[in-house]
Amino acid sequence: MNEFPVVLVINCGSSSIKFSVLNASDCEVLMSGIADGINSENAFLSVNGGEPAPLAHHSYEGALKAIAFELEKRNLNDNVALIGHRIAHGGSIFTESAIITDEVIDNIRRVSPLAPLHNYANLSGIESAQQLFPGVTQVAVFDTSFHQTMAPEAYLYGLPWKYYEELGVRRYGFHGTSHRYVSQRAHSLLNLAEDDSGLVVAHLGNGASICAVRNGQSVDTSMGMTPLEGLMMGTRSGDVDFGAMSWVASQTNQSLGDLERVVNKESGLLGISGLSSDLRVLEKAWHEGHERAQLAIKTFVHRIARHIAGHAASLHRLDGIIFTGGIGENSSLIRRLVMEHLAVLGVEIDTEMNNRSNSFGERIVSSENARVICAVIPTNEEKMIALDAIHLGKVNAPAEFA
C-alpha cells in the first residue's frame, strides 16, 4: 500500500466526467474537477474551479488521460490506491457496491439498456481507468443498490406480470448513494439507533427524490424504473397520468420519442414557469411577483410535501425529515414552504436556524416543540463512494463510517 494512499472517484455522465481525489485516511478532498462537452469539439477540463482548458482529445479516454496528467502534476498519480466509480443503474443484480471484475463489467453491461445514456458512459470510464491505472483496485458504487431492500409491494407496478418477469419492469429508485450517506449522518445528528429509526430523506436538486429509510434500509422511494417518476423536478414532469400523455399524442401527432423529450427536458419547474429550470432564478422571480414562477414553486413544494407524508406511511415511526441536495441544503424558502405544508405531521419550523446559510453545515431546523425533527444534512456522494472503495479495498476507514 502507498505511504500516502488516495482514492480517485469518477462519475462519468452522458457528456461529462466529474472527479475528485480524496485522502484515504480522512476522506479530505485534495482536488476535484470536471471534464465537460465530451465527444464534442467544445470539450474542456476544469480543475478546482479553475479556468476551463480545451481538451486535445474529446473522448472519455482522452478526458481521463488529461485528468491523470493533472494528478501527475500534483505528484498524486502514484498514490492512487483505489478508484471508485459511480454507476447509474445496477438493476436487480447489484444490491451493494462491488469490486470491479470481468464478471461485474459483464453484469453492468447486461443492465445497461435500463440506463443507456449513463451506464455505457460509466463503462467507458471503467475501461479507460483500467488502462491508465493498471493493477489499481476499482470499485463500482450503484445509484440503485441502496433501494434493493424495498419489498415487492413497494417496487412493483400494477402492470401485467409478464412485463416484470420478462423485461424487468419495476421500480429501482435512484440517488441511493446520497440517501445512504445522509441517513447514516442523520443517525448521528439525531442520536438515533440505526436498527430502530424512521427517516424520510428529501434529496432536492435539479433531479429530486424522496426515500423512506427504516432501520437504516431503504423501504420506499419516489423515483421508479427511471429517474422520471415521483417529484416534479427542474425539467422533469415527475408523476403524470399516462392517459394525459396519450391524449396529448392524439391531439398533436407527437411520437413517443417526442413526448419522452417533453416530460424529461421541457417540463417541471421550466415547463410551468416558462422561465427557467434553475430554482435560484425562480426564487428571484417569486419575490418580484412573477405569477408562473410562484405557481411552479408552489407545485414543486406541494409534490415534495405529499411524497414526504406518503413515504412516512412506510415507516414504523417518523423520527426525522432530512433535507439534502443543492436545493434542500441551500433554499430556506423551499424548506419553509415544505415544512408549513407538513404541519399535520407535527412539524414546526425554527426560522432562525432555517435561515442560516449552508456553510453552517449539519443543523436541525425544526423548533424544540416539534413532534418530528427536521434537519439539513449536506450530502457527500463522493465521500460515500470513497468509503465504499476503502471498505472493499481493505484500507482503514475513517472512524465515523468504520
Curated annotation (Swiss-Prot):
Record-annotated active site: 143 (proton donor/acceptor)
InterPro entries in the record: Ac/propionate_kinase, Aliphatic_acid_kin_short-chain, Aliphatic_acid_kinase_CS, ATPase_NBD, Propionate_kinase
Record-linked HAMAP family: Acetate_kinase, Propion_kin_subfam1
A GO cellular component entry from the record: cytosol
Protein name in the entry: Propionate kinase
One function term, GO molecular function aspect: acetate kinase activity
Site (Transition state stabilizer): 175, 236
Originating gene: tdcD
